[in-house]
Amino acid sequence: MASWQENLFVKSLDNGLALTPPMGWMDWERFRCNTDCKNDPDNCIGEKLFMDMASRMAEDGFKDVGYEYVSIDDCWMSHNRTADGQLQPDPARFPSGMKALADYIHSKGLKLGIYAGIALEDLTYYGTKTCAGYPGTIDHIQQDMDTFAGWGVDYLKLDGCYSDPDKMDTGYPMVTKALNNTGRPIVFSCSWPAYQSAKKTPNYTWIAENCNLWRNYDDIQDSWQSVTSIVKWYGDHQDEMIPVAGPGNWNDPDMLIIGDFSLSFEQSKAQFALWSVMASEGNREIWARPLSNGSVAVVLFSHSESTPETIEASFKMVGLSAEKAEARDLFEHKDLGTFTGSFHAIVNPSGVVMVILSPVTVLDV
């Protein structure tokens, strides 16, 4: 007999979305819950901010290299639903409405992401709230998904504050079903395992059947310590997560914080490179991800905070079966030559070297 999980829900993977990891811009780490548009109009959570960012992404080249989502995090809503129970944006901060904002973003060749919160506790005690205290969605699931689809939303991040982590195994799939019912293709980003992993090992197979991507660990903060804690957690738990990751299903280590306030140039390069591959741990780390053409993306990462270090990665270690390989530095945009058996490089403190290793075919003489 098939399980109820198999019968009740259409797999989110079947939506055909997120065949590569979604890329874009999200406001939270930089702007948080700044709702003071009267005194700080350029930095508050309002339509002006997201229209400005959409313009920058389209005009400054980000869209051309794959950054396509402009995503609104918490604090966009009014504190009250409409009389018929519909979510609505704060009218003072989004005077044109969310549909108009979606239309503007789409006109730039980009896509709109939005945030909601699911509450699964005793509603008489906890209420239904997002993490910042705005209306949650547990008692309006289909209505809210229909609202998002009607606005033209392309990506949904569903958070889990005020939720019992044990109930997420049924709560999040309820939203999956509601999204599928809308008929609109919407990428589904879940926070599901991030709330469960402190207590138990999440069921990643079930999560991957219902989500396009999922957060696994704490929120990132604007600090190097936060970045390294996420990297360590991923290194410690990669055997649990790697088997289910691939086109349509991705582990989400949270936002890039490059361009904010705390990271040095080398640390920014390190986060960028590591977020691209995420596949080991130690004081000198070697991360690798196989590519579809037989090459391997490799990141050499140094935890040293004082002097540069030489780090070597054997081809066997990174999953390359060839005897020889050509290396190309992705940050320097230059070829480094042919290497035999291993690749090595000098890595700056708290820095990375990121290369593509491409097998060289040795012809018989």
Model-derived regions: residue spans:
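C-terminal beta-strand-rich structural cap/linker in extracellular carbohydrate-active enzymes
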Residues: G337-V365
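Aromatic-lined carbohydrate-binding/catalytic grooves of carbohydrate-active enzymes
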Residues: R30-N39, G46, F50-P165
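Solvent-exposed beta-hairpin/edge-strand motifs
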Residues: K316-E332
